[in-house]
Each structure stands twice: as structure tokens, then as C-alpha cells.
Amino acid sequence: IIITGKATLAGRPLMWTHRDTGAPYNHIGYFDEGGYRFLGLVNSDDPEGAVWTGSNETGFSIMNTASYNLKDDDIKEMDQEGNLMRKALRVCKTVQDFEHFLDTLPRPMRVEANFGVIDAYGGAAYYETNNERYYKKDANDPNLAPEGYLIYTNFSFEGRTDEGKGYVR
């Protein structure tokens, strides 16, 4: 769930996620590798340190939910969401920065996910993302989120209807 500042007492955006994973051991890592410093959730047995949710020193935060109905190609090498989020935390300060980041990534991106992002300036959006494109869902859009929040699980609204997982949630 991502919540805009208009729906919180403090007037700041908020993100809340849970983690569906088969990795039983996780930890919060501190990253200072050039760019913005950040904290990120990583699988403890992952030597590469893919980040599955995190926040950086500017107030930019990111998470994802897997999508199972948005992929529209036959590319086999996938599951780069954690690497994408690690890079985004290093270089993004705002929701607009994240959009530019996605625009400039080489294709295929090797992802099928809904990335939730918030920033310290009130930005709050989901990006339904596959190998070639993304669809932005802005939680500040009163037509889309009249109460100031969006809830996602393991499917994308722009994806194939009644395919995938997560509809019962």
C-alpha cells in the first residue's frame, strides 16, 4: 500500500509492504556505494545483495509486488527486480527521478512487477512494469485514488484480466 500525505496525520506519504519470499533469512543492509546512501532489505544468503525494499537518505523509498499478468514476451532470464531497486535507491530522489530512471534503462529490463515509490516531496505512485514498458498509477490523482491511497498485490491492472495470481487478495 502507498498512501499520500493527504491521507496521513503527518501530511507525509507512507508505504507499507509485506514480503512473500521463500528466503527464510533476511536482514537490513546499509549501502554507501556512490550516489545516495540507503538501507535495504536483502536475502542474507545473497552475495549480490539484491534489495527487495528500501529507503535512501533523501526520503525516496521503493518496494515491489510481483506481477503475474503483465509479461508479454518469451524472455526467460528475469527476476531482476531486486537489482533494479538497489540501483534506483542509489540514484533517485523523487518519483520523477524514478520515472526517468525507468525511461533510460536498457531493454529488456528483465522484470515483471509493480514498483511502489514515495518521496519526501509528497510523490507516491505505482509503476506496473514489464520488460519493455511501464504504466504509472499516481496515488495523488484524485480520479484514480480519491482517498489518497492505492493497494496492490500480485497482479497489474494493465495486465491480462483473470490471469496470474493475487486476485483473491
Predicted features by range, described:
Residues 4-90, 113, 119-169:
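C-terminal, well-structured catalytic/ligand-binding subdomain of enzymes
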Residues 81-109:
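Intrinsically disordered, low-complexity linker/loop segments enriched in Gly/Pro
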